[in-house]
């Protein structure tokens, strides 16, 4: 059970109440690597998203990315290796216990080099900034997958299991609080995190799913987990996936909070909206960015992908969500 326990009657009043590949609990069988679709980033290397004007991101790339170490995990079970980027908290003290967050990038990072998993956006770097570490000293790990590890048909790669053994090995090497391990990811990374919630129930204290979806019929277990699930209404597949999970929660009578707002609202307004959600005392939280609001002025959507690639960083900019994540414990 979660250490953060809410009163059931209060929840019911405050929350929205809703009436090699293998066949496995997190996806469907298949042979070979996952193909295109959202897991494959719909064929786009960067979705046409130019982030050079995001001065905060460019500063993070310059100041934070060099603080990560590129390491290699040797997996005894498969005889394979997996590179990963690791941030160790400054002044790490082995007598203290630290949370750990895993960020899984979208598949545009596959084949783009070991630095791109960090430089592609906010999702990997934000947790290691001085401001975030001052509040939440934490380990940050970003796997460097060499293949697209999930696809829109819910096929999944054995590299995911290697990455999980990597996380376990880190808990044995460093003083990591195993009650405060989190996973997040965008597109392929969010889909992988959905798969992990099924294949490794109870391992993570909380989840942050961004711009992604999974087979909702397999996600009943999320009714007992803590998460934020953030998509753009202009992302056809991710928004449909969110709607399907909401329908599942409704059918099961699960409680949750769901809000929609403009991604162009200022930071204070958006963080206040998150605070209003959290005041409902739900552990299952859904955010939808209003259609068109993840596009910058003059920007056009990515064809059939809509606002898929443009929505990710807006989710990771939500400070109140980041703070909430680190409050969660098993």
Residue ranges of predicted features:
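A domain-start/cap signature at the N-terminus of enzymes
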Residues: 23-100, 184, 191, 257-264
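Active-site machinery of serine-nucleophile hydrolases
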Residues: 100, 104-164
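Primarily recognizes the serine-hydrolase "nucleophile elbow" in alpha/beta-hydrolase
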Residues: 172-173, 179-223
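Catalytic His-Asp charge-relay segment
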Residues: 224-232, 246
């Amino acid at each position: 059970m979660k250490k953060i326990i809410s009163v059931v009657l209060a929840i019911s009043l405050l929350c929205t109440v809703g009436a090699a590949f293998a066949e496995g609990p997190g996806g469907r069988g298949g042979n070979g690597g996952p193909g295109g679709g959202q897991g494959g980033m719909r064929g786009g290397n960067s979705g046409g998203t130019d982030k050079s004007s995001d001065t905060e991101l460019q500063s993070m790339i310059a100041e934070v990315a060099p603080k990560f170490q590129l390491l290699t995990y040797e997996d005894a079970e498969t005889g394979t290796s997996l590179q990963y980027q690791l941030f160790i908290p400054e002044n790490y003290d082995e007598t203290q216990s630290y949370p750990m967050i895993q960020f899984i990038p979208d598949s545009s990072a596959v084949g783009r080099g070991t630095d791109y998993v960090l430089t592609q956006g906010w999702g990997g770097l934000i947790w290691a900034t001085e401001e975030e570490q001052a509040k939440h000293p934490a380990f940050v790990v970003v796997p460097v997958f060499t293949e697209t590890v999930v696809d829109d048909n819910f096929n999944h790669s054995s590299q995911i299991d290697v990455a999980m053994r990597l996380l376990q090995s880190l808990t044995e090497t460093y003083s990591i609080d195993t009650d405060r391990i989190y996973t997040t990811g965008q597109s392929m990374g969010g889909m992988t995190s959905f798969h992990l919630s099924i294949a490794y129930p109870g391992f993570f204290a909380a989840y942050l799913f961004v711009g992604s979806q999974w087979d909702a019929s397999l996600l009943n277990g999320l009714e007992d987990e803590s998460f934020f699930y953030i998509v753009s209404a202009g992302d056809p597949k991710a928004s449909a996936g969110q709607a399907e999970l909401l329908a599942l929660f409704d059918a099961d009578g699960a409680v949750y909070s769901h809000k929609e707002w403009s991604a162009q609202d200022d930071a204070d307004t958006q963080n206040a909206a998150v605070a209003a959600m959290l005041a409902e005392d739900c552990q299952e939280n859904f955010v939808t960015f209003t259609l068109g609001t993840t596009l910058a002025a003059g920007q056009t959507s990515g064809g059939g992908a809509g606002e898929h690639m443009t929505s990710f960083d807006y989710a990771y900019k939500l400070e109140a969500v980041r703070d909430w994540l680190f409050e969660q414990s098993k």
